[in-house]
């Protein structure tokens, strides 16, 4: 999902107590990294997927934390502060999309990826599912993951650097390197297990923060009457449809379409110990998400009353959470709340680093070394996986070194890119026996191209007609579905093994 994106301009005071809290947070992450390293067996599946042994609670919060990023704590409250309750449509779309994802994608993907050659990456699953002997589908989907996630990761590093610059007055590059070092350390050594455990830990911190800040803010304002004050300041602040057209509402709501194709989220379903644990994970995960998003909305709404009440000049709405945490809380608690922002940022970075690393190792290096070498030289492949984490991180840091780099403009559209290219393909692969390799490649590429074309040439025409301002995932998703279906109908049908496998997956999923 989006990170802070813009410069954080509000300076806040930090003392030794705040630094201690941040240091304790970093120390816990390092310890978890060591734990993950000690648990490692030298097996690639273990390093990249935790050996498919992750429990439901870690699965749930890991999926949520890696999904939300700094957007939930920084971006969403800032958006609600600026536009009012109408910004909540995106939270409705995301929650509904995540909920459906647990039902429609999670069980079948967990079973099918293990059945289809024990695939540990999404491109590997596509290859095995469609018997892609030429590896065309695997290479193209792998390239999409590597390119877009490198850009995605760099935006997280930028957010981390700017947080330290804003909250502590430290040099941006120092903050960037510090965040990068900690994330690289526990991801490099601990692999998937460490990333999942840290995501769980960070998810708990994020949830506490999103509940604590709006409650304390209301206690220091007018209690529940704060919302009455917000409405009195401007009645449309609590209007769910304020300033939104039908196109605008649909665009915000359609963010949920992207969930079916986000590699760093759906890989969590692949790693759970059993598909039978998914209902428990779903209940916790969706509850966490709903409470967290509602808390973020509440931060934005209470912020509308908080800023004038405390005579604060808020130059950047995205700094609202930082300012409220520093003004309302003791520095020690303020440090904990700043750690929550770091948790949101770092949980996403680590997940994206690992997915990109697994794609480089499993989808490219294995093609060079061969399947047999991969089976007999597991430790070599684990080391390549670790080195890939380092390489991707270095590239992302290099791009992030200049925070004003124009590549930042592309990152906000990565969700749509993955959603349009992978979401339809994942659904077809899990449910339709008629899907062909040609249909899969054509649909995936066409979805990505439509998103790029829409962003570059169609959206700038929004001033002519509102329809051109439609969120790019919608046309990209629709075109991908149509192209995948039509091309599959016109090309050679897959073997009978596909229907057999689909039936087997369906039967296993139905087992209680």
Curated annotation (Swiss-Prot):
Instruction: Please write the reaction equations for the catalytic activity of this protein.
Output: L-proline(in) + Na(+)(in) = L-proline(out) + Na(+)(out)
User: Does Transcription regulation show up as a keyword for this record?
Assistant: no
Q: Which InterPro entries match?
A: Na/Glc_symporter_sf, Na/Pro_symporter, Na/solute_symporter, Sodium:Solute_Symporter
Q: How is the protein disposed in the membrane?
A: Multi-pass membrane protein
Instruction: State where the protein is found.
Output: Cell membrane
Which is an annotated GO molecular function term of this record? L-proline transmembrane transporter activity
| GO BP terms, alphabetized | proline transport
Q: Which of UniProt's keywords are assigned here?
A: Amino-acid transport, Cell membrane, Ion transport, Membrane, Sodium, Sodium transport, Symport, Transmembrane, Transmembrane helix, Transport
What GO cellular component is one of the record's annotations? plasma membrane
Primary localization: membrane
TM spans, by residue? 16-36, 54-74, 85-105, 139-159, 174-194, 200-220, 240-260, 286-306, 327-347, 381-401, 410-430, 438-458, 467-487
Give a short account of what the protein does. Catalyzes the sodium-dependent uptake of extracellular L-proline. Since most S.aureus strains are L-proline auxotrophs, this transporter may aid the bacterial persistence during an infection of tissues with low proline concentrations.
Q: Which family does it belong to?
A: Belongs to the sodium:solute symporter (SSF) (TC 2.A.21) family.
Tell me the protein's name: Sodium/proline symporter
Which organism is the protein's source?
Staphylococcus aureus (strain bovine RF122 / ET3-1)
């Amino acid at each position: 999902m989006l990170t802070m994106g813009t410069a954080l301009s509000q300076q806040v005071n930090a003392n030794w107590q705040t630094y201690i809290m941040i240091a304790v947070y970093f120390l816990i992450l390092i310890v978890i990294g060591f734990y993950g390293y000690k648990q490692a067996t030298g097996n690639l599946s273990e390093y990249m997927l935790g050996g498919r042994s992750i429990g439901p609670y870690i699965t749930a919060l890991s999926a949520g934390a890696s999904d939300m990023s700094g957007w939930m704590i920084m971006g969403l409250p800032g958006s609600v502060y600026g536009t009012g309750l109408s910004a909540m449509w995106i939270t409705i779309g995301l929650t509904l999309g995540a909920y459906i994802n647990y039902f429609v994608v999670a069980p079948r993907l967990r079973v099918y990826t293990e059945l289809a050659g024990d695939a540990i990456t999404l491109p590997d699953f596509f290859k095995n599912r469609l018997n892609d002997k030429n590896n065309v589908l695997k290479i193209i989907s792998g390239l999409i993951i590597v390119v877009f996630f490198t850009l995605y990761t760099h935006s997280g590093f930028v957010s981390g650097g700017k947080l330290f610059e804003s909250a502590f007055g430290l040099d941006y590059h120092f903050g960037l390197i510090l965040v990068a070092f900690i994330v690289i350390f526990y991801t490099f050594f601990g692999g998937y297990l460490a990333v999942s455990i840290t995501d769980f830990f960070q998810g708990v911190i994020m949830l506490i923060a999103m509940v604590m800040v709006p409650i304390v803010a209301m206690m220091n304002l007018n209690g529940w009457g704060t919302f009455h004050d917000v409405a009195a300041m401007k009645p449309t602040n609590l209007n769910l449809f304020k300033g939104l057209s039908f196109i605008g509402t649909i665009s915000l709501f359609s963010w949920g379409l992207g969930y079916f194709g986000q590699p760093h989220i759906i890989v969590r379903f692949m790693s759970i110990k059993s598909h039978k644990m998914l209902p428990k994970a779903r209940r916790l995960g969706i509850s966490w998400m709903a409470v967290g998003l509602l808390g973020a909305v509440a931060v934005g709404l209470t912020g509308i009353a908080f800023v004038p009440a405390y005579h604060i000049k808020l130059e950047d709405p995205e700094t609202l959470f930082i300012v409220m945490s520093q003004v309302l809380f003791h520095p020690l608690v303020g440090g904990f709340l700043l750690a929550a922002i770091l948790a949101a940022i770092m949980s996403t970075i680590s997940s994206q680093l690992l997915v990109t690393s697994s794609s480089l190792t499993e989808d490219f290096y294995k093609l060079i070394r061969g399947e047999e070498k991969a089976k007999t030289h597991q430790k070599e492949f684990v080391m390549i996986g670790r080195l890939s984490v380092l390489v991707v991180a270095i590239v992302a840091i290099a791009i992030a070194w200049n925070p004003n780099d124009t590549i930042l403009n592309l990152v906000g559209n990565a969700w749509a890119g993955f959603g349009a290219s992978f979401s339809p393909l994942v659904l077809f692969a899990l449910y339709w026996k008629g899907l062909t390799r040609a249909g899969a490649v054509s649909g995936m590429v066409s979805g990505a191209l439509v998103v790029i074309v829409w962003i570059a040439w169609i959206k700038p025409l929004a001033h002519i007609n509102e329809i051109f301002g439609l969120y790019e995932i919608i046309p990209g998703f629709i075109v991908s579905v149509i192209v995948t279906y039509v091309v599959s109908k016109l090309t050679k049908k897959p073997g009978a093994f596909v229907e057999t496998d689909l039936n087997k997956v369906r039967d296993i999923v139905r087992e209680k």
